[in-house]
Amino acid sequence: MGSQVSVESGALHVVIVGGGFGGIAAASQLQALNVPFMLVDMKDSFHHNVAALRASVETGFAKKTFISYSVTFKDNFRQGLVVGIDLKNQMVLLQGGEALPFSHLILATGSTGPFPGKFNEVSSQQAAIQAYEDMVRQVQRSRFIVVVGGGSAGVEMAAEIKTEYPEKEVTLIHSQVALADKELLPSVRQEVKEILLRKGVQLLLSERVSNLEELPLNEYREYIKVQTDKGTEVATNLVILCTGIKINSSAYRKAFESRLASSGALRVNEHLQVEGHSNVYAIGDCADVRTPKMAYLAGLHANIAVANIVNSVKQRPLQAYKPGALTFLLSMGRNDGVGQISGFYVGRLMVRLTKSRDLFVSTSWKTMRQSPP
């Protein structure tokens, strides 16, 4: 797909809604193919959120995790909040009244969740970086820290804190018995638990925080009392929430109401076309495909969507997306980790080499064709 695509002037114009991992992969490919496109995101820079948790504990790391869109995509990037999609007139509607015409649409809106794992705000690059540097200070001030939620974000968060600050007392509270994601091999989930115990993390499993609404999040306090449904009380200085990831459907919910899965993701066919709309593709978290929500999968979806837009214009057969065996790596601080590659267990050495040290930051700078700071 390296060669450029010749199209009739004005016949093809792709709008990509959302500049996460799927969005920048699609935009980079369209740019290389010389296909007219516009990437829209409410931030002015791509957030490499795979490294967001390390940026919350290590001073100076956050600047490596935000990469300017306009430097890479120039006039093919528009900062704005998408408030709706007009399917009849093929327009993406922005807050403030601007309308972006499209012949083809790629929805790559991702998911939302609590800071620091996610950063979902209309923001400048500098303000976003500062938010993480402020978080580092809150962590540094706190002797006792509670992490709520023991999915992949929660276990990685607890490990990052204990790696950077071994003297801090970290308690992880999780409503299930097993840690990390249910799609993972039992042996991987068990090793996650062992790593946390070796690092000295206190685990409260099968307990749910019962006073979450009353708790200040991400802010140091002299004394915070965390209570669970089992009657356990934990005194802490800082509470970090790592649960509640939701599909970000606000941009398209109204236009595609009849095409939504219960999660808010869009129902797609094997070509990643939204049901009933051959010129609209959904990729990444907002596509209802039976795989975990992961950055590298969003990139694979982008390859399919871009190839199929080109193939449809050239009247060639469309490619199908076929999920393979799961690859899932958990970085447990920069020196540790565990996971599985194509369904097979991999230990610390492999995960450390592939993910833990750099958290794929250099890959995103390469995709954006920029040099890291």
Swiss-Prot record:
GO molecular function: DNA binding; electron-transferring-flavoprotein dehydrogenase activity; flavin adenine dinucleotide binding; oxidoreductase activity, acting on NAD(P)H, quinone or similar compound as acceptor
Keywords: Acetylation, Cell membrane, Cytoplasm, DNA-binding, FAD, Flavoprotein, Lipid droplet, Lipoprotein, Membrane, Mitochondrion, Myristate, Nucleus, Oxidoreductase, Transmembrane, Transmembrane helix, Ubl conjugation
Predominant location: other
Cellular component terms per the entry's GO annotation: cytoplasm; cytosol; extracellular space; lipid droplet; mitochondrial outer membrane; mitochondrion; nucleus; plasma membrane
Lipid moiety-binding region (N-myristoyl glycine): 2
Domain of life: Eukaryota
Membrane topology category: Lipid-anchor
Modified residues annotated as N6-acetyllysine in this record: 168
Cellular localisation: Lipid droplet; Cell membrane; Cytoplasm; Mitochondrion membrane
Residues spanning the membrane: 7-27
PTM per Swiss-Prot/TrEMBL: N-myristoylation at Gly-2 mediates the recruitment to lipid droplets and plasma membrane, enabling its anti-lipid peroxidation activity. Acetylation at Lys-168 prevents AIFM2 ubiquitination and degradation, thereby inhibiting ferroptosis. KAT2B mediates acetylation at Lys-168, while HDAC3 removes it.
Gene Ontology biological process terms from the UniProt entry: apoptotic mitochondrial changes; cellular detoxification; negative regulation of ferroptosis; positive regulation of apoptotic process; regulation of cellular response to oxidative stress; ubiquinone metabolic process; vitamin K metabolic process
Sites annotated 4-hydroxy-2-nonenal adduction: 174
Binding annotation for 6-hydroxy-FAD: 18-22, 54, 82, 285
Catalysed transformations (reactions): ubiquinone-10 + NADH + H(+) = ubiquinol-10 + NAD(+); phylloquinone + NADH + H(+) = phylloquinol + NAD(+); menaquinone-4 + NADH + H(+) = menaquinol-4 + NAD(+); menadione + NADH + H(+) = menadiol + NAD(+)
Cofactor(s) listed: 6-hydroxy-FAD
Tissues expressing the protein: Detected in most normal tissues as two transcripts of 1.8 and 4.0 kb in length, respectively. Highly expressed in heart, moderately in liver and skeletal muscles, and expressed at low levels in placenta, lung, kidney, and pancreas. Both transcripts expressed following p53/TP53 induction. The shorter 1.8 kb transcript seems to be the major transcript in EB1 colon cancer cells.
Cofactor remark from the record: Binds 6-hydroxy-FAD non-covalently.
Induction note: Expression detected at 4 hours after induction by p53/TP53. Down-regulated in a wide range of human tumors.
Phenotype upon changing residue 156 to A: Impairs the reductase activity toward coenzyme Q1/ubiquinone-1. Impairs ferroptosis suppression
Alphabetized Gene3D superfamilies for the sequence: 3.50.50.100
Activity regulation description: The modification by 4-hydroxy-2-nonenal (HNE) adduction in mitochondria results in loss of the oxidoreductase activity and activation of a novel function in mitochondrial oxidative stress signaling.
Family membership noted in the UniProt record: Belongs to the FAD-dependent oxidoreductase family.
Subunit field text: Interacts with importin subunits KPNA2 and IPO5; this interaction likely mediates the translocation into the nucleus upon oxidative stress.
Function recorded in the entry: A NAD(P)H-dependent oxidoreductase that acts as a key inhibitor of ferroptosis. At the plasma membrane, catalyzes reduction of coenzyme Q/ubiquinone-10 to ubiquinol-10, a lipophilic radical-trapping antioxidant that prevents lipid oxidative damage and consequently ferroptosis. Acts in parallel to GPX4 to suppress phospholipid peroxidation and ferroptosis. This anti-ferroptotic function is independent of cellular glutathione levels.
Protein name: Ferroptosis suppressor protein 1
Organism this protein belongs to: Homo sapiens (Human)
